[in-house]
């Protein structure tokens, strides 16, 4: 049986003080329409009992976009962001709505990053409240938004952007590289004494036909032992799943619809010729094919 990549990693670590979310990126692949979300923070599931750590901020709606609600995370704000994303608001419209309708009437402490896909048009937007903890900022590109607070400095965000833009391959490759760009001791300054960038992290990618609760790639590190960087744990899992698609190419300039039939003769999917077909089997074997 073929399955999507979904990994949840929880490694016991001692409880630590409460903190806020730190650096993250949301992005859309303009060709495949994949939606991606990745980030990390110097907080974990033990620090915030009952939560999955950094991934708390991430909301992906396959085929529509993603939004991160970070810095003084508020569940009601995130629920509203989700609703507006489903309703077809653009990234900027979602964030503007959140600013003017903050659940606690205090948008100055919030930070948001959003990316949307509406009628083939990708829009990105971000907001950094003036009362977020320094260093704080965000960067926007045509198909991505990068944001962070409690950072070592602007260099963390710049490195994330550079890695994202200059790494070849799939959206997941670029997001993984972007996280690595922030893997600096004390990237979240609260983690400097721990000699890591952060304590929990995530990397998520959705195909346009995925369910929001069943994403194509969903790697979550809720917590790690002392002195183990969660970005390294994600990288190891990413490598184990053989998700590097550096040789990806579209072989046909004019793709045609391809009907995929299972062994019983039932139509199970439609793909375009030239599209990469990527399968992960229960036994761990990875198979990559180009539809012809």
Each language-model region and where it sits:
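Residue-level detector of functionally pivotal "anchor" positions at catalytic/ligand-binding pockets or at interdomain
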Residues: 242-268
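N-terminal nucleophile
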Residues: 20-242
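Residue-level signal for well-ordered, solvent-exposed loop/turn and beta-edge residues enriched
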Residues: 32-34, 121-123, 246, 266, ...
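Short clusters of small/polar residues that mark proteolytic maturation junctions
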Residues: 39-40, 128-129, 270-272, 290-291
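Short coil/loop residues immediately preceding or within conserved phosphate-binding loops
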Residues: 22, 255, 274
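C-terminal tail/sorting-segment detector
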Residues: 276-292
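Bacterial Sec-dependent N-terminal signal peptides
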Residues: 1-21, 245
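Acidic surface patches and DE-rich sequence motifs
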Residues: 29, 116-119, 262, 270, ...
